[in-house]
């Protein structure tokens, strides 16, 4: 069940927002604390503005007037707030009313609860924290459930992967109806996974005022993450990194899971502790993971087995689980290689073998590129502005250059320019130079392309960098970084689908 949080300043604007999204939502939460004016009669009638709803039935509405101290927008007299809640609920149009945990302890909400009982409105008993999880969430759920018929609600902002794990465990171990959701980047997965965690409902929003709290719009929830199809048997896949919310991977993998008929979902998880993530992966029974910066190296000690691509490159970008545990590979290697090999087979009779290539850059991204090239018998020259780094990476990868040569030089110097000219069948750019927002930069502005070079830039934002544009203008065939992303993601998708079949069997 998916509820949209409404935070517009007028009742009519909120009704319009709700009606625009009736295709994707099951109900709404009216955040009356965001209203510029709160006339009691109009507030009480608000649910009637949404009739009829989906399937010609009424739209369930939660009435919430959140105090400033709980992360809301209401700063007025507490007695006035409670009277507003009492009178609006007493009209009998709201399906739920949200009341904070402290009100039941003091008994100050007795009149609101009495009005709710008479009108058939269910009470949601809530706890909110923007400063971590606020202690033992399991115990708090028990306290929030103390009054019969009330639905406990926990909305917190986890500040770490460990706190997300605490939230997930609390929801999975709870019994009965509950709403346990996280806010912010660390809490985002709990929004999507609410049905998997056994929650009664989750929240979404299109209003920027609720960006931190609700996190994602209704259409994305339903069309990308297929929220309404998720259940406690759904397989959970993830991409981990820090930061992670910019990742393109959910938009790539989720449609492919749907096309394959998989009861699976792929979510971004912000990870500050790899150890905590693997505890979370065990709790959620995660069969496959995409790994991005800064965790490609730090995940390796947690894996049962790694293949040569991980050993050579020193980084793992894909994890899958089998009967014996998690295994790691690096699909960046073949993801980079596939579009290049396709072009090479059409240009040269022997394909890549025996060609001469220059790799610009000696950072982490270059290692997968260098390893892929020398594995295919390409003679490689590594150029970097810090010469010692170019030398180090070539020495580390030289044991894998079984049928190829591997040399190095200083980028921008005469010697380096000479090496570049002698290794110009293929030129691969692996640095961040030219990446958004630095789009006017070029890693080798002094080099004059001749038109015979096959030029590859692994940067995919922008799709065509200044480096690639200059090469294309000189008649060179170019390969965009987006092709590498697509290639490695496709390989990941195959591995994830295999892991899903193994899990299902």
Can you say where each PLM-predicted feature lies in the sequence?
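NAD(P)-binding Rossmann-fold cofactor-contacting core
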Residues: 378-400
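Short, conserved loop/helix-junction motifs that constitute active-site signature segments
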Residues: 54-56, 117, 352, 444-453
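Phosphate/diphosphate ligand-binding glycine-rich loop within oxidoreductases
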Residues: 234-348
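Glycine-rich adenosine-cofactor-binding loop
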Residues: 182, 237-243, 330-333, 340, ...
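Rossmann-like adenosine-cofactor binding region
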Residues: 402-478, 483
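Catalytic alpha/beta core domains of metabolic enzymes, predominantly
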Residues: 102-233
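Active-site beta->alpha loop and helix N-cap motifs at the rims of alpha/beta catalytic domains
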Residues: 2-118, 122-134
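Active-site capping/gating segments
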Residues: 338, 342, 460-461, 476-503
């Amino acid at each position: 069940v998916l509820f949209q949080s409404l935070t517009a300043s007028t009742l009519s604007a909120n009704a319009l927002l709700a009606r625009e999204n009736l295709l994707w939502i099951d109900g709404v939460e009216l955040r009356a604390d965001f209203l510029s004016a709160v006339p009691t009669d109009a507030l009480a009638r608000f649910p009637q503005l949404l009739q009829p709803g989906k399937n010609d039935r009424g739209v369930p509405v939660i009435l919430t007037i959140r105090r400033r101290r709980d992360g809301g927008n209401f700063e007025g007299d507490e007695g006035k707030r409670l009277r507003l809640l009492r009178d609006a609920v007493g009209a009998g149009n709201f399906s739920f009313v949200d009341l904070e945990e402290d009100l039941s302890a003091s008994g100050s909400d007795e009149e609101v609860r009495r009005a709710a009982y008479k009108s058939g409105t269910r009470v949601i008993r809530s706890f909110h924290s923007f400063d971590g999880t606020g202690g033992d969430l399991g115990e708090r759920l028990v306290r929030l459930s103390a009054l019969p018929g009330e639905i406990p609600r926990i909305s917190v902002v986890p500040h770490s992967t460990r706190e997300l794990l605490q939230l997930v465990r609390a929801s999975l171990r709870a019994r009965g109806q509950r709403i346990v959701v996280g806010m912010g980047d660390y809490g985002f997965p709990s929004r999507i996974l609410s049905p998997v965690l056994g929650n009664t409902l989750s929240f979404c929003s299109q209003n920027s005022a609720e960006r931190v709290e609700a996190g994602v719009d209704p259409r994305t929830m339903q069309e990308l993450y297929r929220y309404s199809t998720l259940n406690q048997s759904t397989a959970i896949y993830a991409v981990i990194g820090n930061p992670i919310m910019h990742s393109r991977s959910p938009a790539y993998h989720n449609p492919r899971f749907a096309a394959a008929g998989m009861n699976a979902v792929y979510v971004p998880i912000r990870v500050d502790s790899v150890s905590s993530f693997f505890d979370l992966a065990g709790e959620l029974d995660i069969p496959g993971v995409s790994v991005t910066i800064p965790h490609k190296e730090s995940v390796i000690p947690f894996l049962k087995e790694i293949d040569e691509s991980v050993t050579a490159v020193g980084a793992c970008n894909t994890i899958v689980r089998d009967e014996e545990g998690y295994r790691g590979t690096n699909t960046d290697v073949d993801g980079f290689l596939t579009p290049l090999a396709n072009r090479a087979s059409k240009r040269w009779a022997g394909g890549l073998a025996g060609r001469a290539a220059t790799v610009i850059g000696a950072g982490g991204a270059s290692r997968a590129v260098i390893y892929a090239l020398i594995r295919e018998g390409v003679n490689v020259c590594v150029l970097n502005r810090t010469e010692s780094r170019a030398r180090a990476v070539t020495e580390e990868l030289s044991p894998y250059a079984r049928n190829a040569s591997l040399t190095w030089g200083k980028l921008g110097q005469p010697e380096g320019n000479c090496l570049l000219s002698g290794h110009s069948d293929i030129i691969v750019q692996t640095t961040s130079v030219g990446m958004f927002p630095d789009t006017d930069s070029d890693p080798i502005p002094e080099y004059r392309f001749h038109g015979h070079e096959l030029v590859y830039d692994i940067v995919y934002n922008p799709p065509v960098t200044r480096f690639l544009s200059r090469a294309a203008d000189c008649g060179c065939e170019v390969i965009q970084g987006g092709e590498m992303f697509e290639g490695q993601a496709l390989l990941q998708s195959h591995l994830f689908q295999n892991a899903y079949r193994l899990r299902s069997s």
